[in-house]
Amino acid sequence: MSKLLPIKVWGQGGPNPPRVAIILEELGLPYEFMPIQLSQVKEPEYLAINPNGRLPAIYDPNTDLTLWESGAIVEYLVERYDTAHDISFPRDTNDAQHARQWLFFQASGQGPYYGQACWFKKYHPEPVPSALERYIKEMNRVSGVVDGYLAKQPVPPGGDGPWLVGNKCSFADLAWVSWQMTLKKIIQTEDGYDVENFPHLKNWLDRMVAREPVKKVLSAVMPPPS
């Protein structure tokens, strides 16, 4: 990996960019953050990189590839660089398909519902209780799916699971971390969501945030209160 050129990354904070940085750290890939403010994402210079005007995006000079959408970036990084399958699985195996399934569920379930709940709690110009209630119900539903699934997964002797796929921590698990940590700063128990109601999910998250690559990324963008 030492011969690789640094991958350029636009976006560092927020719920989605850390997902990419976590994978880069887990794989030991060189990368550099490109300075950009949220006020600049709709400007022509950045729209030429990501026409959707959102963060993150990457440019990999090793393959001359520009890519946006965090889930697509995660898939690319593990398919291209995780040849030892440290956090992924061999192509054409059931585990590889199941990992993709959970990544897509994160992108279609956790991301949109958690995002809308946070929007209506913190950013919407006026309170809309029915909207907040709807999205928090969906947060509870999605968390229940993950919690119930983890509860049924066997842990082999000496294992550190349970995990979503293949008895190891993979990109399918790691993709969920940053939104869950963002949520802690915005949604409170009185809003109707408490991670303590999902003990298997909470334990799973605790195990992931204890990993050194995850700690490094989160400490940079979500420092603990002093």
Curated annotation (Swiss-Prot):
Residue ranges of domain GST C-terminal in the record: 92-226
Enzyme Commission no: 2.5.1.-
Enzyme class, first EC level, given as a word: transferase
Annotated PROSITE patterns: GST_CTER, GST_NTER
Pathway(s): Secondary metabolite biosynthesis
Alphabetical keyword list: Transferase
Example of a GO MF term: transferase activity
Coiled-coil ranges (or none): none
Pfam families membership: GST_C (PF00043), GST_N (PF02798)
Domain GST N-terminal: 4-85
Function statement: Glutathione S-transferase-like protein; part of the gene cluster that mediates the biosynthesis of geodin, an intermediate in the biosynthesis of other natural products. The pathway begins with the synthesis of atrochrysone thioester by the polyketide synthase (PKS) gedC. The atrochrysone carboxyl ACP thioesterase gedB then breaks the thioester bond and releases the atrochrysone carboxylic acid from gedC. The atrochrysone carboxylic acid is then converted to atrochrysone which is further transformed into emodinanthrone.
Protein family per UniProt: Belongs to the GST superfamily.
Protein name: Glutathione S-transferase-like protein gedE
Lineage summary: Eukaryota, Fungi, Dikarya, Ascomycota, Pezizomycotina
Gene symbol of the encoding locus: gedE
